Amino acid sequence: MSTNSFDGSIVSSYLTTRMPPWAGVRQNVMGSSIDGRPVLPANSTTLTYETVSGTPLETAASAAASAAAATARGIVTDFAFLSPLASSAASRSSARDDKLTALLAQLDSLTRELNVVSQQLLDLRQQVSALKASSPPNAV
């Protein structure tokens, strides 16, 4: 079977990568689909996607999917490409942490102020209750 022929089956590494370790599947060994056809292992450098019917649109889509998978794999393994992105993400994370710390400090300050105001309100209620209790009923 040629890897470029699209004869109706969907071929992926799903069947070999999802098997439990006790099933004896090795990552560098060719697997097989339900109907016994070969499936490339999960650590293969090429993933091919075959289509159900061989229309030109599906063929182009499967070629694009294969190219996207290869590109994604290349990007993931290219640490030189990822390191500026990682440092940028780390600086954004640090800035977010600083903002969060400032917000938490403000929240703590507001909580203390709220406690003071709540205590003052409680004192005022007690004073009003004491005044009502000590004043004659018709004085209001």
Curated annotation (Swiss-Prot):
Gene Ontology cellular component list: host cell nucleus; viral capsid, decoration
Comment field on protein domains: Three N-terminal domains of hexon-interlacing protein form triskelions between hexon capsomers.
Main location: virion
InterPro entries, per database record: Hexon_assoc_IX (IPR005641)
Provenance organism: Human adenovirus C serotype 5
HAMAP family hit by this protein: ADV_CAP9
Family label: Belongs to the adenoviridae hexon-interlacing protein family.
Name under which the protein is recorded: Hexon-interlacing protein
GO biological process, one term: symbiont entry into host cell
GO molecular-function term, one example from the UniProt record: hexon binding
